Amino acid sequence: RIEDFAVESIWLNKMNSEDYEKLNNFFWFFSLDLKSSKKSTQSVISNWINNNNKYNKDSWEFDITAKRIIAWLSNHQLTYEDSEKEYRSIFNHMIQKQTNHLLNEIKNSNEVENKMIGCAAIILTGLAYKNKKVYLENGLNLLKNIIKSSIDNQGFPKSRNIKQLVFYLKYIIIIREWFKESQNIIPEYIDETIYYLGSSYAFIYQNINNDIFFNGNYLSDNQEFNQYLKRFGYTFKNEVKELAGYAILRNKKIILTMDIGSSPNKDFSKDYQAGALSFE
């Protein structure tokens, strides 16, 4: 219940780092019922602001801050609607203050996943505050750079990491849906990137309905993501047998998957585990 969190003392409790991150990134807002109390939800945010208005390295950590912006703005029906004028002023100020923090720090982030989440948060702020075009312009420039530097011409991460493929596809689709919801023109390169990433996703997952355990991948449950794609009308196809250094051969009884590609560049090899000619 949101009311259980609407007490100021919750932000002063000691907890382990995992619980601290979950509490402060506010992604738990996505599990709230839309019938939850707006007043209580806004009280939770007010209490957080009272205790975290000034920068501190823990609650303002880059990834936590980016997710918090996304959670606050995505749940605007609870976090913003029917609020008092003073609250709206403070809320708007804190969103922009946190977004400025992301813009200042994103160049120092070494994790491409964090950069993508930060980039998404900056874009969302730009779409939500139409009088602040600088956020949208900067966010889209960052997105272009991430796509250019991290995704190859076939629409596969240069790391050849399958988890990253799903991550990129998920966030770029989310960004596209924000453009639709805000009735802004969707940049053509976003549609193009989704097409190629989606084609790669169809090759890896949808054609075999199973995980392949190469290059840092693990057993995953993409059922929820597949339902998300279906809900918003995204369908992808790919009939090739080889892509991005992976080969998949199958008949009615057996699926043979092979990693026949080169090792990724050292800048993208953090999670690389299997060498060339690995089989499953």
Q: What is the predicted function of each stretch?
A:
Residues R1-I10:
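Extreme N-terminal leader/anchor segments
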Residues A6, A66, A71, A120-A121, ...:
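A sequence-composition feature that detects small, non-aromatic residues
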Residues S9-W11, N50-N51:
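Short glycine/proline-rich turn/loop motifs
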Residues K14, N108, L142, G233-T235, ...:
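Residue-level detector of functional hotspots within protein domains
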Residues N16-I194:
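Aromatic-lined, polymer-binding surfaces characteristic
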Residues D152-E280:
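Carbohydrate-active enzyme catalytic cores, enriched for enzymes
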